[in-house]
């Protein structure tokens, strides 16, 4: 017993030393409930993703990688983060290396396209220099790079089609991230790199998938989000969207491996009322009796939302104060109330 106590004391000192050297959150128990730290974040624009992140969104001063197969919803998730940053008075920039941003779709997701900074660089070095300048200005809250695969080094663009350019992009990313990481940390901006997956040739065992641009981004990222479409959303016989799973395969500021499942509707993205309804049902805030749904608000009044999900969503859309209350309750339950906000119980006191 005394041996055990002694071990705990030694471990406590070791953890204290590690945190002093490498910062708070560099080591923690995986099952810690209070692993949520007082970290400044930018909301992802999705309550489910904020919960899975463990800290209420993407941490400021850090690099985040969002990766997955084609058409899995990576850019949609990044655009929701931009809309969220702008909604809270922040300035966002989109480095469109793929030259594929759809302003109409971005606007549908809530992005203020009139005030969104956009760059369409000709080659990788130019894109990363633009990111560095924006970050060092200390005036930008969020920068999204879409995508790493499109950050083609200048030497490759200026060379001939048949030239063999081994490891150029990986070297470019490694060099750029060494410089960027410190500047990002000082500026308190969030930099999101969107990345694509590729299949490794000749892999017999393990996961044959890998991401482009070498391994530097994996190391420098505080969070790595794997985005995958896991099913279609249908209305009658018509497909209206995809069910998407977001897995935090790396998280330096909270326990990793948490998942969020969101509905991404074509042309609309992650619809707030739909997401809150699904979460409220899962959390037991909205009760279900057969096909009827009901909700008891903070005053104790029971609201019969309607029969079926669509009627219930219509009711909530006509009563936006209930949607706000549901979101607050969900965030409070997961310890994600923003700084300065109080829970309903604290407000009553």
Swiss-Prot record:
Localisation per UniProt entry: Cytoplasm
InterPro entries: AAA+_ATPase, DNA_recomb/repair_RecA, DNA_recomb/repair_RecA_CS, P-loop_NTPase, RecA-like_C, RecA-like_N, RecA_ATP-bd, RecA_C_sf
A cellular-component GO term for this protein: cytosol
PROSITE patterns: RECA_1, RECA_2, RECA_3
Matches recorded under CDD domains: RecA
Any Gene Ontology biological process: DNA repair
Chief location: cytoplasm
One Pfam family cited in the UniProt record for this chain: RecA_C
GO MF entry, a single one: ATP-dependent DNA damage sensor activity
Keyword ATP-binding: yes
Binding sites annotated in the UniProt record for ATP: 68-75
Key words of the record: ATP-binding, Cytoplasm, DNA damage, DNA recombination, DNA repair, DNA-binding, Nucleotide-binding, SOS response
Its job: Can catalyze the hydrolysis of ATP in the presence of single-stranded DNA, the ATP-dependent uptake of single-stranded DNA by duplex DNA, and the ATP-dependent hybridization of homologous single-stranded DNAs. It interacts with LexA causing its activation and leading to its autocatalytic cleavage.
NCBIfam families named among the record's database cross-references: tigrfam_recA
Family: Belongs to the RecA family.
PANTHER family found in the cross-reference section: MITOCHONDRIAL DNA REPAIR PROTEIN RECA HOMOLOG-RELATED, RECA
UniProt-recorded name of the protein: Protein RecA
Organism: Thermosipho melanesiensis (strain DSM 12029 / CIP 104789 / BI429)
């Amino acid at each position: 017993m005394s041996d055990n106590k002694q071990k705990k004391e030694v471990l406590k000192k070791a953890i204290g030393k590690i945190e002093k050297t490498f910062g708070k959150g560099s080591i923690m128990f995986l099952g810690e409930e209070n692993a949520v730290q007082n970290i400044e974040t930018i909301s992802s624009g999705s309550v489910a993703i904020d919960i899975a992140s463990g800290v209420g969104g993407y941490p400021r001063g850090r690099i985040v990688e969002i990766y997955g197969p084609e058409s899995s919803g990576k850019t949609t998730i990044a655009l929701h983060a931009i809309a969220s940053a702008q909604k809270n008075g922040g300035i966002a920039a989109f480095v469109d290396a793929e030259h594929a941003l759809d302003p109409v779709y971005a606007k549908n997701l809530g992005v203020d396209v009139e005030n969104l900074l956009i760059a369409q660089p000709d080659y990788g070095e130019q894109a990363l220099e633009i990111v560095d300048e924006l970050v060092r200005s200390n005036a930008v809250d969020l920068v999204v790079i879409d995508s790493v695969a499109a950050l083609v080094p200048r030497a490759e663009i200026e060379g001939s089609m048949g030239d063999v350019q081994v490891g150029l992009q990986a070297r470019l990313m490694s060099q750029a991230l060494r410089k960027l990481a410190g500047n990002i940390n000082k500026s308190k901006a969030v930099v999101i790199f969107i990345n694509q997956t590729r299949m490794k040739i000749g892999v017999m065992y393990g996961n044959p998938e890998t991401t482009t641009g070498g391994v530097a981004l994996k190391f420098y990222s505080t969070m790595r989000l794997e985005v995958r479409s896991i099913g279609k959303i249908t209305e009658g016989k018509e497909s209206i969207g995809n069910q998407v799973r977001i897995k935090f395969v790396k998280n330096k500021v909270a326990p990793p491996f948490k998942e969020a499942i969101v509905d991404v509707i074509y042309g609309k993205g992650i619809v707030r009322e739909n997401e809150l309804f699904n979460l409220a049902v899962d959390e037991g805030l909205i009760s279900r009796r057969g096909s009827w749904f009901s909700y008891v608000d903070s005053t104790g009044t029971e609201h019969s939302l309607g029969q079926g999900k669509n009627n219930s969503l219509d009711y909530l859309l006509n009563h936006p104060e209930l949607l706000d209350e549901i979101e607050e309750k969900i965030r409070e339950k997961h310890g994600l109330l923003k700084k300065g906000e109080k829970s309903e119980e604290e407000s009553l006191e």
